[in-house]
Regions:
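Flavin-dependent oxidoreductase catalytic cores
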Residues: 1-174
Length: 174
């Protein structure tokens, strides 16, 4: 994309993309954290009412959350705590960049709905770490590769409320 390789926590192919992603190096991780922070700061400077950070649906941050797509053996892979590290570091940099008085929403999939992906218990644990980093959480379900609808108009209203109510209980955030 844009003449650059797709980045991912590990070189694990996706059925959606036809290219093998490049495993992120320590330098990539550092740069991407700063890119998120810079983008959030620009949103604030340009008059946005808040910023949303997408940790759902098989996008980059959610790839780190899943043992299926995150097969790293360093501090960003393996244990649940390590898989949470990069998304939490991104959110910490975003919060630092925009300040406490600017709303930050985090979008998560309450479950990846993938055989070897993450489940609700994982996301309850992740959401419990968002206090001070986020002001609210938007909850959906699944990834684009999951066998459930992902397009909003294909999903009945309230379909993921069972996931969001559990996330709210563990995070204390709306």
């Amino acid at each position: 994309i844009l003449g650059r390789p797709l980045l991912a926590p590990s070189a694990v192919p996706s059925p959606i993309y036809r290219h093998m992603p490049k495993e992120m190096t320590a330098e990539d991780i550092k740069r991407v954290k700063e890119d998120f922070a810079d983008a959030a700061a620009r949103c604030r400077a340009w008059g946005a009412d808040g910023v949303a950070v997408n940790c759902s649906a098989g996008y980059l941050l959610s790839l780190f959350l899943s043992g299926e797509t995150n097969q790293r053996t360093d501090e960003y892979g393996g244990s649940q705590e390590n898989r949470f590290r990069f998304p939490l570091e991104v959110l910490a940099r975003v919060r630092e960049a925009v300040g406490r008085d600017f709303p930050v929403l985090v979008k998560i999939s309450g479950s990846s709905m993938r055989t070897r992906g993450y489940g609700l218990k994982d996301m309850e644990a992740f959401s419990s770490k968002l206090s001070g980093l986020a002001d609210a959480i938007g909850v959906t379900g699944g990834w684009h590769e999951a066998p459930v609808p992902q397009i909003t108009y294909q999903v009945p209203r309230g379909f993921y409320s069972c996931l969001s109510s559990c996330i709210k209980e563990h995070s204390g955030l709306p």
